[in-house]
Amino acid sequence: MVEKFVSAERPQTEEGMQYHIACKPGDVARYVLLPGDPERVPKISSLWDEAREIAFHREYRTHTGKYKGVPISVTSTGIGGPSTAIAIEELAAIGADTFIRVGSTGAIQPGIEIGDLIIAKAAVRLEGTSKQYVRVEYPAVADLEVTLALIEAAESLGVRYHIGITASTDSFYLGQGRPGLNGYFPSFARNLVDDLRQARVTNFEMEAATLYTLANIYGLRAGCVCAVFANRVTNEFGKAGEKEAALVASEAVKILAEWDEEKERAGKRVWHPGMRG
């Protein structure tokens, strides 16, 4: 039997099952973690009190459960802006409103070690997806509450972290200042790392700019925490900090849930513990 979708504009079934992520209303919590790799989904959800697999369709794998009593979900986005935009569009359509990217990154500033975490307060829009949503001058910035929750979580867990501006690209190689094949290394790529380093950009990854742009224009909340796998200053590469990033993101959700309850009781539009009477 062919599954019936009710619209070509927003493909979904009558019960709201989304075309790409294969999730419907009620399947995900309002707080969703966003790794790129589907294999990271069970690694992240294994840190929670409980979790179950909701769907695994294409690159989109979703688990929903609870972390320290707070409903939470995780959905993989695949690599880059296009698939990330699809995930955000469809997750928001079924009730999610707060997103934290949990990924890996390459650092370009000195003093950042393999396994450290970087919390991105903003993103340079070097990718193309966000440009199909809004003018290039539009800033890609993280939500203040989410960023503060990530910082508080990192502090409470005692992990090494940095706060900075990421550069989101569509290319892992030339787009991040790495040489291509057969000696292809044009000047715009050769100079990219130095130019961004002078501008105090901290790292490269491939999804935050799309996430931040869409979250802001749609009235959602978003933040990003990444483990440093590559150090472009020392030319080192190693997979470290993945668990710590997942724990910080999960703990940030618990903190946000507490703040959201306090915010509602106080009748405020934004919240931070410093606003307690």
From Swiss-Prot:
Coiled coil (residue ranges): none
Under InterPro entries, the record lists:
Nucleoside_phosphorylase_CS, Nucleoside_phosphorylase_d, Nucleoside_phosphorylase_sf, Uridine_phosphorylase
Q: Where does the record place it?
A: Cytoplasm
Pathway(s) where this gene product acts: Pyrimidine metabolism; UMP biosynthesis via salvage pathway; uracil from uridine (phosphorylase route): step 1/1
GO MF assignments: uridine phosphorylase activity
Cross-referenced Pfam families: PNP_UDP_1
**Domain of life where this protein originates:** Archaea
Q: Per the record, what phenotype accompanies loss of this gene's function?
A: Disruption of the gene results in a complete loss of ribose 1,5-bisphosphate generation from uridine.
Q: Name one GO cellular component term.
A: cytosol
Q: What is its EC number?
A: 2.4.2.3
Per the record, the GO terms for biological process are: nucleoside catabolic process; nucleotide catabolic process; UMP salvage
Spell out the reaction equation it catalyses: uridine + phosphate = alpha-D-ribose 1-phosphate + uracil
Keyword terms of this UniProt record: Cytoplasm, Glycosyltransferase, Transferase
Question: Where is it chiefly localized?
Answer: cytoplasm
Summary of the function given for this chain in its UniProt record: Catalyzes the reversible phosphorylytic cleavage of uridine to uracil and ribose-1-phosphate.
Which NCBIfam families does this one have? Uridine-psphlse (TIGR01718)
Family under the similarity heading: Belongs to the PNP/UDP phosphorylase family.
What is the designated name of this protein? Uridine phosphorylase
What species does this protein belong to? Thermococcus kodakarensis (strain ATCC BAA-918 / JCM 12380 / KOD1) (Pyrococcus kodakaraensis (strain KOD1))
Gene name for this UniProt entry:
udp
